[in-house]
């Protein structure tokens, strides 16, 4: 204690100096990185910071290339009537016959398109209709004629009017049968059948 009460020498002052630790430059860099919010470690003298920057720039360049590719696809499809508001459409699967190299479908030639002829169908339907009309039994006409004559004698106006219209239509159909036969001939299998001839019916009084 006596030594402490004496005069203070410079060596004693050096002993009482607070110990200040010199900071390493690498620790300073780590501290600055932590303050800036960087999550990757950086050591002085390493190339991690440069590699990170290089990788980030490559990712940005890759994104730019993808954006340019999408824009080129949109510009390519703009003149073909395709909706370009959304992401570019994928080229549909198609054969080389009706699809060009740029994915645009073309209409097939008219010669290659299948053609279906309706002529045989019309001939068969009309021939069967004519055959059916010609093969109506004579008994049906006789019964209808008798019913019509009775109604005319009774004098019902509504019944006479309806029967008169029916008879006129039937006579018109009988007159049109020869024209239908010339326009649409009956099939050979139908012609071999024995068709009962239609007898001439006396004109009924329409009054």
UniProtKB/Swiss-Prot annotation:
The keyword Nucleus does not apply. It is found in: Virion. CDD domains: embe-CoV_Protein-I_like. The keyword Transcription regulation does not apply. GO terms for cellular component: virion component. It comes from the Viruses. Keywords: Virion. Coiled coil: none annotated. Structural protein that is not essential for the viral replication either in tissue culture or in its natural host. Belongs to the coronavirus I protein family. The gene encoding this protein is included within the N gene (alternative ORF). This is Protein I. It comes from Bovine coronavirus (strain LSU-94LSS-051) (BCoV-LSU).
